[in-house]
């Protein structure tokens, strides 16, 4: 294993010594916070701001970062460079102050590119599955004692964090296509899990522009780099001839270089075989449910093969994978006055992701009534994929629909949850329930849940906090039961 001497890098590149303090506007996001954490471990002074406290903010504070709640121009005092997330508007006072003071302002992906510049980078892109695939790759490399640096968009449960500074040359990271900033990255291996219409405002509302951007992402690889792509995705299959780089394919497709077969699932695990060119087949036991996660695992296997990681390390990492926060995360049973229900939480916020969650839940618990509480994310996404959302959400037995999490967007008429409720009601005859705010969701769930139900909370907004509330409620119920037994 090749060790990285960070001090030597700074000596070799004197310009890096000029950067003393790095300020992050929107530091509480998983991607921004992850980069900040790695830089903190590299020895940089970190400051930042966000609109609210969260676990990422608290963790960074524990590492010595100075973090402000709320955005004010004075927050950037002392910064050598300012990093902004995609959620930051052009009129943000810290951004304006940095521009006025002529402090360099860079986007998240540009800073990630700097981290990747001196490392063997693996960049994972695609509309869906980025976080899980990146986590699986990081877990395999860790199991193989390669000690990678990683930056992931979700909490890797086994590490207790979404970012880590490793001491090897490997950097494994998500490549965010939402603002096309992933084009800043120059990795050695690029993964594309799938390509669907999303973030279309970035791409002029033109799917061809989105496809062209993914081709450019692959072509940013050096001529000796490798593209790892899913052959099951029809769009990717169409684009492969344009990549002009060594390409390894994976999937259930008969022609895939890393091919999945004999898939089966039992509750929260799955089993399948993986066939590889000029190598024996592997029998994989994956500690995740769903065919979509089998595809994510196949991508991770294909990447690991590029670095000659042994089959034992691959199999062991996948078998013992401890999961990711808010990715089909199971909280076990919780109790209401009407009985016990199983609670599962998921971050997916695109119709395809919601469909994958529903399919995995149905396969794991085929006899249970499926109750979903869903929070749409962004008005533009709801507008652009309205018909798909209406179709997918109508498949659950009982739907509770929270209003759209705006993520800084202005409301769009007809692209809201009340409209979705009406459409689903008219087309399916089902009765979705509109929920005015996440705060009232636990009480509403308590009124409609029956004994034996499966409850899915889903979305990329603040609905995740509801799960914590339900878990705390369950803990209090158990404490009261114990107290009554003692008396």
Swiss-Prot record:
ATP binds at residues 126-132. GO terms for molecular function: ATP binding; UDP-N-acetylmuramate-L-alanine ligase activity. Pfam families: Mur_ligase (PF01225), Mur_ligase_C (PF02875), Mur_ligase_M (PF08245). Transmembrane segments: none annotated. It comes from the Bacteria. Its EC number is 6.3.2.8. GO terms for cellular component: cytoplasm. Its main location: cytoplasm. Pathway: Cell wall biogenesis; peptidoglycan biosynthesis. It catalyses: UDP-N-acetyl-alpha-D-muramate + L-alanine + ATP = UDP-N-acetyl-alpha-D-muramoyl-L-alanine + ADP + phosphate + H(+). Keywords: ATP-binding, Cell cycle, Cell division, Cell shape, Cell wall biogenesis/degradation, Cytoplasm, Ligase, Nucleotide-binding, Peptidoglycan synthesis. The keyword Flavoprotein does not apply. It is found in: Cytoplasm. One of its GO terms (biological process) is regulation of cell shape. The keyword Flavoprotein does not apply. Cell wall formation. Belongs to the MurCDEF family. This is UDP-N-acetylmuramate--L-alanine ligase. It comes from Psychromonas ingrahamii (strain DSM 17664 / CCUG 51855 / 37). The gene is murC.
